[in-house]
Regions:
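Short glycine-aspartate micro-motif
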Residues: 10-14, 47-49, 104, 156-160
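Short beta-strand-loop/turn "lid" adjacent to the catalytic site in phosphate-handling enzymes
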Residues: 44-87, 96, 101-104, 110-122
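Glycine-rich phosphate-binding loop of actin/hexokinase-like ATP-binding domains
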Residues: 111-208
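A mobile "lid/hinge" subdomain adjacent to the ATP/sugar-phosphate binding pocket shared
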Residues: 208-253
Length: 354
């Protein structure tokens, strides 16, 4: 496969999640066309960009995919067993569909390569950290990067609240702290993931035979979070509807979720030595005024105050802080597809000039 000698106009973006596959054709003007399947991709694809969740220590920048890169991605998959294997399958299928087009991997972990040692280092034995590469990598960086570009303030906190949830502290456009760690399981409670829990609790379950290793992993990944708390649904909008008719389990799940998000925002303010703006993005962050209000209700001591009318009216990009708020609060629609398409063009342009 030869690199294109002409400008890359149309990039097919392949975003493979743990349970979904999203395809979009992005043109040079940033217009995106949703594509139903690889087989139905329109003519004119110049290059293909792939979102890959975990790049490990090896990949800190987008990379042109070849057989050597694929082998290294296979090795990294053990660090993200729910996310990287679907990406690899999607890469294989896309390379088969477009064998004469360049394919570029863009990593969710790359934005967090700027984490300082005090944010990235676990308080574990040095032999484990050094021999096994145990450190905090951070995830959802492509989405966070887009939000940070839209709200370019010195001290920003980005709340990515989708099926996976994280809070990231961004100083002058660079990640300095984030809630996800070695894997995307750490941090906030999520749709079905537990987020951070007492490690001693997990040892207790294993030691006393209450769960096998596989059962424990399945429970932490698929049976916990909002679903485990409510026993109803992993979806914020469904829990809000249940709460509205008096379901106490739904109320508790949403209250815990909002409280943990707010705690992470406050911790991020410590990492940033202050706070200029908060961004809500992804799924519930973009579409749940109730969740945003719940989170910000905990943050008045930081000078955060919402405009209730603007908050209720905003489904998509918008400013929702009250005029009296000392902290800017914005909603930004996540556009990972545009970030990936741009990274593909930059990577291929650099490769053709080397």
């Amino acid at each position: 496969m030869a690199l294109l000698s002409v400008a890359v106009l149309n990039v097919l973006v392949v975003n493979a999640g743990s349970t979904s596959l999203k395809l979009a054709l992005v043109d040079e003007d940033g217009m995106a066309l949703t594509v139903a399947s690889l087989e139905q991709a329109p003519a004119g694809v110049d290059a293909v960009g792939h979102r890959v969740v975990h790049g490990g220590d090896r990949f800190r920048d987008p990379v042109l995919i070849d057989e050597n890169v694929l082998a290294e991605l296979e090795a990294v998959s053990k660090l993200a067993p729910l996310h990287n294997p679907p990406s690899l399958k999607a890469i294989e299928a896309a390379r088969h569909a477009f064998p004469d087009r360049p394919h570029v991997a863009v990593f969710d972990t790359a934005f967090h390569a700027t984490l300082p040692e005090e944010a990235a280092t676990y308080p574990l034995p040095a032999r484990w950290r050094q021999e096994l590469g145990l450190r905090r990598y951070g995830f959802q960086g492509i989405s966070v990067q887009w939000a940070a570009e839209r709200v370019p303030v010195p001290r920003l906190v980005v709340c990515h609240l989708g099926g996976g949830s994280s809070v990231t502290a961004v100083r002058n456009g660079q990640s300095v702290d984030t809630t996800m760690g070695f894997t995307p399981l750490e941090g906030l409670p999520m749709a079905t993931r537990s987020g951070s829990v007492d490690p001693g609790l997990l040892l207790y379950l294993l030691r006393h035979g209450h769960a096998s290793l596989d059962e424990l992993e399945h429970a932490l990944q698929y049976e916990s979070g909002l679903l485990g708390l409510s026993e109803l649904s992993p979806h914020v909008h469904e829990l809000e509807a249940a709460e509205a008719v008096g379901d106490e389990r739904a109320r508790l799940a949403l209250a815990i979720y909002a409280r943990r998000i707010a705690q992470a925002v406050a911790a991020s303010a410590v990492s940033l030595d202050g706070l200029d703006a908060i961004v809500f993005t992804a799924g519930a962050g973009e579409r749940s005024p109730q969740l945003r209000a719940r989170v910000c209700a905990h943050l008045g001591f930081l000078g955060v105050e919402l405009d209730p009318v603007a908050n209720e009216a905003t489904i998509g990009d918008g400013e929702i802080a009250a005029s009296s708020s000392s902290v800017r609060v914005a909603v930004i629609v996540s556009r990972e597809d545009l970030v990936i398409a741009r990274a593909v063009r930059q990577t291929l342009a650099a490769a053709t000039t080397d």
